[in-house]
């Protein structure tokens, strides 16, 4: 049976986690590899598969292997970063693992017993390609970097970093018919122009996004998104055709990897997925079995008590944890 006292100072260093920053794919992988190497009796690093661009979709299994295999224990699944910009969800997963290992090392009996009797599956980053683009370029996107619905960038206006600043900003353009004016409180700010604002000595502005037109035809046409696929619209349950859902369920390797990963682990009793929208704790759809809903209601109550987030009861027409 594993003992917290088995760790050396070198192993403790490997377990260190730098909070307060967002981590690239390789940095995330380094943490997972380090924890697995430092605590092999508790952590096993595996892969659910590879992303569209070939990055590992890693899963960290945590349990006290001295009390049996993870497969024979009730398990809890935690994941994050379903959507590209939800990098906070990834950090929440990393922080969770780091805190868990620290408390186990300190001999926290609640954590020691948890790992002896249960298993935890942690998938910090479901969409590694999208997160990498989000973190290393000025662009934002929904989830996958696969071009959709067009195989190439569509015509029209495309937001771009034109001046190499590393950011896609908004341009302030003087225009007598502009919809904004300078704030009287802070000249750095623009405020909406009121209907009666018609001072000939004042300067009015329009705000335009930084970017350029592809195949400009004389009309102000914004191009459709280059990256329109949503990993969270790819799962088979209640799947229906829509622009972000792709041509068929599990079309994206990321969605397929998660679906197969959960299905293969029949000991999973519950699941928590970290999204970053709404400040809410959402329980599953109303179609869930009544007995399960009672359990989820209790878990949701725990979540709202811990976070202060409001509870949201989801309708059947939207996907889980949108």
Residue ranges and their predicted role:
Residues 56-78:
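Acidic/His- and Gly-rich active-site-bordering loop/insert found
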Residues 54, 74-96, 125, 274-275:
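Short HxH-centered metal-ligating active-site micro-motif
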Residues 52, 65-67, 82-87, 126-131, ...:
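Solvent-exposed loop/turn segments at secondary-structure junctions
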Residues 44-45, 56, 119-123, 129, ...:
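Metallocarboxypeptidase
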Residues 97-116:
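Flexible, small-residue-rich helix->loop connector segments that border functional cores
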Residues 3-8, 49-51, 113-243:
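Surface-exposed loop and adjacent secondary-structure segments within mature catalytic domains
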Residues 2-57:
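Short glycine- and acidic-rich boundary segments immediately preceding or forming the N-terminal edge
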């Amino acid at each position: 049976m594993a003992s917290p006292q088995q760790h050396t100072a070198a192993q403790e260093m490997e377990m260190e986690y730098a909070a307060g920053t967002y981590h690239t794919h390789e940095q995330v992988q380094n943490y997972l590899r380090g924890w697995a190497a430092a605590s092999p009796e508790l952590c096993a690093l595996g892969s659910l598969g590879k992303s569209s661009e070939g990055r590992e979709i890693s899963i960290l299994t945590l349990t006290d292997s001295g009390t049996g295999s993870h497969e024979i224990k009730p398990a809890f699944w935690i994941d994050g970063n379903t959507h590209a910009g939800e990098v906070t969800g990834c950090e929440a997963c990393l922080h969770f693992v780091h805190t868990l290992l620290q408390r186990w090392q300190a001999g926290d009996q609640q954590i020691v017993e948890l790992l002896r009797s249960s298993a935890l599956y942690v998938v910090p980053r479901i969409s590694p390609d999208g997160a990498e683009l989000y973190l290393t370029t000025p662009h934002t996107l929904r989830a996958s970097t696969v071009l959709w619905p067009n195989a190439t960038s569509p015509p029209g206006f495309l937001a771009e970093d034109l001046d190499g600043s590393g950011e896609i900003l908004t341009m302030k353009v003087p225009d007598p018919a502009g919809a904004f004016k300078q704030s009287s409180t802070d000249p750095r700010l623009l405020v909406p122009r009121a209907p009666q604002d018609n001072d000939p000595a004042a300067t009015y502005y329009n705000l335009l996004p930084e970017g350029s037109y592809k195949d400009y035809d004389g009309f102000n046409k914004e191009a459709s998104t280059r990256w329109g696929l949503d990993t969270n619209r790819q799962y088979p349950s209640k799947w229906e055709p829509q622009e972000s859902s792709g041509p068929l369920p599990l079309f994206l390797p990321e969605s397929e990897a998660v679906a197969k990963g959960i299905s293969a682990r029949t000991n999973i009793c519950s699941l928590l997925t970290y999204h970053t929208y709404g400040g809410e704790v959402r329980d599953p759809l109303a179609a869930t079995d009544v007995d399960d809903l009672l359990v989820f209601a209790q878990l949701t109550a725990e979540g709202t008590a811990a976070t202060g987030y409001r509870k949201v009861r989801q309708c059947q027409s939207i996907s889980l944890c949108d």
